[in-house]
């Protein structure tokens, strides 16, 4: 079993983890029955972990979302797809490894699955470009989504990126155009689209595969227009104020659900998805099946209209000192 990587605010659990590991080693090396002591320590560790994660700040949630052992797109796909076949290439000479896609089935329903893919270590992260897709990645995603639309396959996307790659080469290859084209085309696909933020949902890199009929988000994932570090540097010329920026940006599932940006917050195991990835996979699969069944009942025209309306209402607001007037206008704003 790989050693668990503990975040700064999890340090109170370090001593408990050491004791649990020592007892496990004792059980392996001798015939002494330590099951009762092990159960007590594991129960105590779980309780303390729940207490810590119940009161995370937005800045701490970012650390959880970026956890190196957090389940990735491929992890989730392999958990609930036995027939996954990855498809490659943007048909323009490239095959971006930071954004993957392919065919599979969920509960016997054929689907297209695609998402950002980070690495587990430095070497793999270099290959995956730390989950930051280049223009070719978004063009590959568009090609696969067009394929899904042509063959009436629902589209499932998994978002986990700090943002689209912002290097000079990406700009030269048309990063903005590639993302903008995806946004435009996704509004016109006549198949259900479900997007899930499984880790970081950063800026245009997330939006490039995020135009969906249902947008789901794990409890400790984040969704933001810019990283808190970048926001703090821009607004206050001080990256050290990232914690304040994280709070102001409203990046958590709770905030975004209240603002109407996302449709559902998926609960995570105590300690985050990295502590119990199988449980997290079952939660995600159940949510996808529920929303997919609802969307498959809709006619194509209804699907397109609801998708358009969902995004059209974002950002609408009214200005008035008259509270009753605002209440009267709210139904019109949300229509």
Swiss-Prot record:
Pathway terms, separated by semicolons: Lipid metabolism; malonyl-CoA biosynthesis; malonyl-CoA from acetyl-CoA: step 1/1
A biological process from GO: fatty acid biosynthetic process
Enzyme class: transferase
Keyword ATP-binding: yes
EC numbers for this chain: 2.1.3.15
Database matches in Pfam families: ACCA
All copies of domain CoA carboxyltransferase C-terminal, residue ranges: 40-294
Gene3D superfamilies hit by this protein: 2-enoyl-CoA Hydratase, Chain A, domain 1
Top-level taxon of the source organism: Bacteria
Keywords tagged on the record: ATP-binding, Cytoplasm, Fatty acid biosynthesis, Fatty acid metabolism, Lipid biosynthesis, Lipid metabolism, Nucleotide-binding, Transferase
Database matches in HAMAP family: AcetylCoA_CT_alpha
Family, as annotated: Belongs to the AccA family.
Subunit structure comment from the entry: Acetyl-CoA carboxylase is a heterohexamer composed of biotin carboxyl carrier protein (AccB), biotin carboxylase (AccC) and two subunits each of ACCase subunit alpha (AccA) and ACCase subunit beta (AccD).
NCBIfam families: accA, AccA_sub, PRK05724.1
Name listed for the protein in its UniProt record: Acetyl-coenzyme A carboxylase carboxyl transferase subunit alpha
Organism: Prochlorococcus marinus subsp. pastoris (strain CCMP1986 / NIES-2087 / MED4)
Encoding gene per record: accA
């Amino acid at each position: 079993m790989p050693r668990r990587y503990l975040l700064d605010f999890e340090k109170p659990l370090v001593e408990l983890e050491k004791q649990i590991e020592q007892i496990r080693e004792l059980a392996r090396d001798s015939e002494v029955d330590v099951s009762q002591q092990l159960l007590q320590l594991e129960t105590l560790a779980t309780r303390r972990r729940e207490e810590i994660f119940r009161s995370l700040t937005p800045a701490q949630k970012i650390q959880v979302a970026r956890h190196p052992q957090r389940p990735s797109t491929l992890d989730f796909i392999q958990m609930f797809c036995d027939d996954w076949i990855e498809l490659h290439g943007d048909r323009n000479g490239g095959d971006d490894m930071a954004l993957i896609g392919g065919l599979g089935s969920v509960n016997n329903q054929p689907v297209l699955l695609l998402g950002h893919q980070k690495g587990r270590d430095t070497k793999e992260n270099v290959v995956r470009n730390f989950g930051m897709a280049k223009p070719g990645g978004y063009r590959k995603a568009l090609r696969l989504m067009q394929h899904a639309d042509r063959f009436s396959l629902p589209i499932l996307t998994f978002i986990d990126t700090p943002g689209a790659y912002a290097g000079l080469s990406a700009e030269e290859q048309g990063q903005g155009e590639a993302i903008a084209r995806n946004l435009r085309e996704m509004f016109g696909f006549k198949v259900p689209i479900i997007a899930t933020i499984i880790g970081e949902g950063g800026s245009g890199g997330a939006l490039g595969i995020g135009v969906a009929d249902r947008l789901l988000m794990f409890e400790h994932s984040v969704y933001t227009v810019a990283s808190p570090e970048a926001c703090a540097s821009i607004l206050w010329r001080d990256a050290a104020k990232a914690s304040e920026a994280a709070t102001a940006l409203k990046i958590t599932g709770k905030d975004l659900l209240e603002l109407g940006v996302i449709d559902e917050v998926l609960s995570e195991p105590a300690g985050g998805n990295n502590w119990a990835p199988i449980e997290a996979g079952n939660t995600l699969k159940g949510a996808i099946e529920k929303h997919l069944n609802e969307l498959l009942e809709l006619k194509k025209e209804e699907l397109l209209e609801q998708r358009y309306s969902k995004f059209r209402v974002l950002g609408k607001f009214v200005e008035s000192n008259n509270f009753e007037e605002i209440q009267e206008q709210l139904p019109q704003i949300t229509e």
